[in-house]
Amino acid sequence: MAVPKRKQSPSRTGMRRAQNMKFKSTNIVEDKKSGEYRLPHHLDLKTGMYRGRQVLDPKE
């Protein structure tokens, strides 16, 4: 079984792991009622709606 000769530094470990997270994109959805783009599971700041309920007063 292969065994590493030297301990890998935390910096090298972080650099290796950073390659996996390089191209993660955020998932953006279009709101059905207003047509605005927002993050999923977040309320629409323009209308103040979240899951069909009025949570905030809409901005004017």
From Swiss-Prot:
Belongs to the bacterial ribosomal protein bL32 family. Residues 1-20 are annotated as: Disordered. Pfam families: Ribosomal_L32p. One of its GO terms (biological process) is translation. GO terms for molecular function: structural constituent of ribosome. InterPro entries: Ribosomal_bL32 (IPR002677), Ribosomal_bL32_bact (IPR044957), Ribosomal_zn-bd (IPR011332). The lineage of its organism: Bacteria, Pseudomonadati, Pseudomonadota, Alphaproteobacteria, Candidatus Pelagibacterales. GO terms for cellular component: large ribosomal subunit. Keywords: Ribonucleoprotein, Ribosomal protein. This is Large ribosomal subunit protein bL32. PANTHER family: 50S RIBOSOMAL PROTEIN L32, LARGE RIBOSOMAL SUBUNIT PROTEIN BL32.
